[in-house]
């Protein structure tokens, strides 16, 4: 199962993951074969405040595009974006430490085997996306692997 947790409280997705595992076990699948991946929008900067400032224009642009397909003509306000970037929310925006905490919080909820970061959204320049990938690889991934007992393979 690949679970896109893009907004709101990640806890709201837990019943879906629980049902998926329950159905798989009832169908006879061994627990080690019942995999869960979590995916979400991510932006890492030196501080939480800097990440919010830098990522807001791209995330707002992304949602404006998505909303246009559904006939919604409401822009994402900075205040809404700041709330969506809070500690207990799904959006992975902040310092490396905050990203680690959010991934680990969701790991405790879902017990997922894989996390997929959606970085290049909303017209973000390549240089910004590359910087985020580098921070993810150097500052976040090693800690997550250590905390979850996973190897880099």
PLM regions and their residue ranges:
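Active-site-adjacent structural elements that line small-molecule/cofactor binding pockets in enzymes
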Residues: 1-153
